[in-house]
C-alpha cells in the first residue's frame, strides 16, 4: 500500500513531539510505502492533482530517524490514502489546497471540507458527555467564574495553537491570571478554550 502525508516542512518539525512523524513511522513499520509533500508542492492540471513528493524511509523503525528521496511528480490517485497533517496557522495557500483536494478523486482520510469547517479544538464540543468541563470565551470574568463554579485548576489554550504552545494551567490563587488572559486573548479580542 502507498500512503502520502501532507505535512509542514520536515526541517521545522519537532521529531520528539510531531505526531506526523510517528504516524509515518508506524505506516512504514506496517509495510506501507510512505511519501510526503507540502502545501506548495501541489499542481492541478488536466483535471488531475499531482504533487512533488518525497519517499520517506525509516532505516531503523525503532528510531525516529528517517531518510528522504525525491521522486517525480506523483498523481495523487495512485496513493491508497492521503492524510493531511498540516498544522496551524492556516493561510490562503492551505485553503486553496483543500479546495483542490476536493476536486480530486482520492481517498483522503481527513476530508478537506471537514478540515475547513471544523476547528480541531472545537470539534470536541460535539461530545460533552466525554470531555471535562469546557468553556470557549474571551472573557476574564468567565475564567474567574470557573473557579467559583468549583474547578480547582483550569487549562487555558488558544483555539488555533498546536504543539503545546501558549497553553497555561491556572489555579484560583495564581497572581498572573490577568496577565495570562491579556496575552492569550489579546485583551479579549480572541476566544480561547478553558477546561477543568
Model-found features: residue ranges?
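Extreme N-terminal starter segment of soluble prokaryotic enzymes
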Residues: 1-4
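Short, well-ordered coil/turn residues at beta-beta hairpins
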Residues: 6, 83-86, 158
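Extended, domain-scale alpha-helical bundle/helix-rich regions
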Residues: 7-11
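Conserved N-proximal alpha/beta basic substrate-recognition cap immediately N-terminal to
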Residues: 12, 16-136
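Generic structural signal for individual residues within well-ordered alpha-helical segments
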Residues: 43, 143-144
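Short acidic, glycine-rich loop/turn motifs
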Residues: 60, 158-160
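Phosphate-binding site of ATP-dependent enzymes
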Residues: 140-141, 147-153, 160-196
Amino acid at each position: 500500500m502507498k500512503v502520502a502525508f501532507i505535512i509542514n516542512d520536515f526541517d521545522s518539525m519537532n521529531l520528539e513531539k510531531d505526531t506526523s512523524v510517528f504516524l509515518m513511522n508506524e505506516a512504514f513499520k506496517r509495510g506501507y510505502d510512505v511519501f510526503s509533500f507540502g502545501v506548495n508542492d501541489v499542481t492541478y492540471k488536466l483535471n488531475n492533482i499531482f504533487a512533488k513528493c518525497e519517499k520517506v524511509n525509516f532505516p531503523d523503525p525503532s528510531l525516529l530517524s528517517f531518510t528522504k528521496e525525491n521522486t517525480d511528480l506523483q498523481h495523487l490517485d495512485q496513493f491508497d490514502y492521503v492524510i493531511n497533517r498540516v498544522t496551524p496557522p492556516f493561510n490562503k495557500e492551505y485553503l486553496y489546497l483543500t479546495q483542490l483536494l476536493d476536486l480530486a478523486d482520492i481517498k483522503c482520510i481527513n476530508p478537506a471540507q471537514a478540515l475547513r469547517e471544523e476547528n480541531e479544538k472545537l470539534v470536541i464540543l460535539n461530545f460533552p458527555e466525554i470531555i471535562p468541563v469546557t468553556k470557549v470565551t474571551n472573557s476574564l470574568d468567565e475564567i474567574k467564574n470557573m473557579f467559583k463554579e468549583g474547578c480547582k485548576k483550569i487549562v487555558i489554550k488558544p483555539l488555533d495553537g498546536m504543539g503545546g504552545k501558549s497553553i497555561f494551567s491556572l489555579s484560583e490563587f495564581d497572581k498572573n491570571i490577568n496577565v495570562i488572559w491579556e496575552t492569550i486573548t489579546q485583551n479579549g479580542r480572541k476566544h480561547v478554550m478553558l477546561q477543568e
